[in-house]
Amino acid sequence: MDQNPFEASYEYAIQSDKQDELAAFQNEFYKKADTIYLDGNSLGLLSKRAEKSLLTMLNSWKEHGIDGWTEGEYPWFFLSEQLSEHIAPLIGALSEEIIVTGSTTTNIHQVIATFYEPKGIRTKILADELTFPSDIYALQSQIRLKGLDPNEHLVRVKSRDGRTLDEEDIIAAMTDDIALILLPAVLYRSGQILDMKRLTAEAHKRGIHIGFDLCHSIGAIPHQFQEWGVDFAVWCNYKYLNAGPGSVGGLYVNKKHFARLPGLSGWFSSRKDKQFDMEHTLTAAEHAGAYQIGTPHIFSIAPLIGSLEIFKEAGIDRLRQKSLHITRYMLHLIDYELTDKGFTIGNPLEDEKRGGHIYLEHPEAARICKALKANGVIPDFRAPNGIRLAPVALYNTYEEVWKSVRILKKIMTNEEYKQFENKRGVVA
């Protein structure tokens, strides 16, 4: 597939789809006719395999009852650990360093409760002012639980432009009073990729544990955690990994920390052969499974089984290659068709700094998103003035990208957006 130059013609889009080596995966997903879904960075589409694995799990309950914990196609008792083997290639880690459990926010509470140990002058947590609000709420809660004031002990790196973070500023903020760092791998608005390898090395030079929120990176970009030495990470599985709304999240802990007792424990923290001894002294699992707390939500895990099969076949490197190409193509069309429509491109243009979605800014963003939906294009609004468009490598086409930009041009030229209020819905 040619890297450059792109062409603005419809024929170019069709030809690009013919050359797409991942095109067959589009048939794996339920896509509505007359709808262009560009919101996979918020909630991925349902695949037929994810549907099948959920139905298989329901049938296991029907057929086996309580014995479903150890019988059936996917015995529930070992499911979280077994899925770790399929996630490992996506983040470049060992399977024993990964567990499917909790949600992003509860997993943040888990890793912070484990790794945040304020002592002496090292009492502060370093985050950033652009991160997702739930991360901040969790950090503030954990600081309060230590009897400290979040206003004093939570440091947020400021953005120079309101969209991105400068890694030099992050490193400069790694001062002697920082005990722990939590940063997004990819910023949820602008899609900027942070240099996790460099930031981890700089944190470790200063004796600081560092972890990342992978919600907007896992399934979209490759990671090499074994090489980089990241201490911990958390993520959701319902965006690029297409495991469904409310699906169980994921947690990574570097194996060098396995001797550390989890900050939050429960009976599923136990070593499997000891769990049903019902002792009041925890014998923790000797891997990331120790970071589980309660009984796993089996039906919220089940769709991930089918979804991860697709990722194994497609390969994260091929997915990233297409993602980069199709987002470059969309940026080219936006520049060609929408230069006089008041849009500002808010995402990095460099491939190595751009995640899986495009971020446009416009004063009328909220009602432009409503107009797009009225025209069959599903975007994502993010306050105060952002439009996120995610052409997902597994199921979006170049033709869809071409059509969506043309529709956006029509909306702006005809001022169709003025039919709507310029404020977000209950769920943006």
UniProtKB/Swiss-Prot annotation:
One of its GO terms (cellular component) is cytoplasm. Pfam families: KYNU_C. Pathway: Amino-acid degradation; L-kynurenine degradation; L-alanine and anthranilate from L-kynurenine: step 1/1; Cofactor biosynthesis; NAD(+) biosynthesis; quinolinate from L-kynurenine: step 2/3. Pyridoxal 5'-phosphate binds at residues 104-105, 132-135, 213, 216, 238, 267, 295. InterPro entries: Kynureninase, PyrdxlP-dep_Trfase, PyrdxlP-dep_Trfase_major, PyrdxlP-dep_Trfase_small. One of its GO terms (biological process) is quinolinate biosynthetic process. Its EC number is 3.7.1.3. The keyword rRNA-binding does not apply. Its cofactor is pyridoxal 5'-phosphate. Keywords: Hydrolase, Pyridine nucleotide biosynthesis, Pyridoxal phosphate. It is an enzyme of class 3 (hydrolase). Homodimer. Catalyzes the cleavage of L-kynurenine (L-Kyn) and L-3-hydroxykynurenine (L-3OHKyn) into anthranilic acid (AA) and 3-hydroxyanthranilic acid (3-OHAA), respectively. NCBIfam families: kynureninase (TIGR01814). This is Kynureninase. The gene is kynU.
